[in-house]
Amino acid sequence: MAQPTHSEIQAVDPVLTNMLVGYMQADDRFIASRLFPAVPISTQSATYYAFTKKYWFLDSLQKRAPGTGFARSGYGVETATTSAALWGLEHPIADETRNNNQMPMDLERAGLQWLAQQSLIRKERAFASDFFANGVWGTTDNNSATDWDDFTNGDPINDVLTARRVISNNTGQDGNTLAVGYIVHQAIVNHPDLVDRVKYVQLATMANVEGAIAAAFGVSNYLVGKASYNSANEGQTFSASAIIDDDALVCYVAPQPGIMS
């Protein structure tokens, strides 16, 4: 046999330079920033004003007798405070590690993408904890007997229309947004009531189907939260968990948050 052998002169297999397996989630799987657009502030804490709602729904005009003055009325103003907590994370790269890197991707770029993913996960989890929760909103339905994956008793269209009507009556704005977890989206697309309404979509692309679902619910925005995270501790076996699970939120979202919106 000819010597030296292949295994003797090649201590390790060559590194592929055109392939690198990754598990980074696409940005559009996260919906927090799309559901509630950020309002930038110049200080960590701030005070903001709000008109007192009840005055804007009063029927205050009164008849005026000839030669008399008009009845007078007005509106109230309230203040509230907000505080922006500072979150951060470092990903140090030692010079020795950088110099010995054999991956077909520089470590700074990989680290930047990893940090961006960490930021998205933290924001999405905080968002889900704060807003997909009982007691946060004026109306909550936690009746498992009418879940939307129950194709006999579940009635997603009526539930959403009812929620939109409640929002309209209490705010003067029509609920224009429905946000759901991925498991809820799967129940919706398979529900007979929705299937019957979207079956004539010209081309059953994901965008067309989701647009037809939004139209069936009467909302402008239909958002599906698909992001997941590792719920195990760092040293434990990976455990995938949906950030937004079997939840749905109907709300009004100002297209461009600002003064009087």
Question: What is each PLM-predicted segment?
Answer:
Residues 49, 83-85, 90-92, 179, ...:
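Residues in well-ordered beta-strands of folded domains
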Residues 173-261:
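Extended oligomerization regions of viral-like shell subunits
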Residues 95-177, 182-199:
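Alpha-helical scaffold segments that mediate packing/assembly in large oligomeric complexes
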Residues 1-37:
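N-terminal alpha-helical "arm" segments
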Residues 32-38, 73-80, 162-167, 206-213, ...:
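Intrinsically disordered, low-complexity boundary segments flanking structured domains
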Residues 10-12, 47-73, 89, 98, ...:
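N-terminal leader/assembly segments
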Residues 22-91:
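Assembly/oligomerization interface modules of large self-assembling protein complexes
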